[in-house]
A protein has these predicted regions:
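Hydrophobic alpha-helical segments typical of transmembrane helices
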Residues: 9, 67, 76, 88, ...
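Alpha-helical transmembrane segments of multi-pass membrane proteins
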Residues: 1-2, 62-88, 107
Length: 156
């Protein structure tokens, strides 16, 4: 759903700005962010509550189900921030500010996530769950940066 909200807000922002209505673009972005946050928080709740059942849909080996369930539980917590990162990136893209979402994605994946995952797994030996924790932190970081860029209003 996050990607769908991103595409929807991108279209609404582009159309609103094309009509000379930046306040409308801002209002609909905030509404879309709220809807996406709620929808993906609910999905996260489902992930968390049914982590083991969801994991068992793909594999039955007990140890893999155990570790997979833990990863799904962590993924549950990244859903709200993933929603916000997608929505604010979409809003900025719709406004023609395409570089910031690209820069933030590069920063998040290649400067933050990959090195930290490497350190967590190979240096600190935290294991597979740490990969998911770092990914959740990456989306939190991205959502905060993109929200700040959007809130700054320079895209108007």
């Amino acid at each position: 759903p996050g990607f769908g909200f991103s595409v929807a807000v991108m279209t609404i922002v582009a159309r609103s700005l094309g009509q000379g209505k930046p306040d409308r673009a801002e209002r609909f972005t905030k509404i879309t962010a709220g809807l996406a946050f709620v929808a993906m928080s609910l999905m996260g709740g489902i992930f968390f509550l049914f982590a083991e059942s969801l994991t068992r849909l793909f594999i039955a080996e007990p140890q893999v189900v155990y570790w997979g369930s833990l990863c799904v539980m962590v993924a549950a917590f990244e859903q709200p921030t993933l929603a916000l990162a997608y929505v604010f990136a979409g809003a900025l893209r719709g406004a023609g500010d395409t570089r910031w979402p690209m820069y933030v994605t590069i920063l998040g994946v290649w400067i933050f996530r990959m090195p930290l995952v490497y350190i967590c797994v190979h240096v600190w030996q935290f294991g597979i769950v740490s990969v998911w924790v770092v990914t959740a932190l990456d989306f939190l970081l991205r959502s905060l940066i993109l929200w700040r860029r959007f809130a700054g209003g320079g895209w108007k």
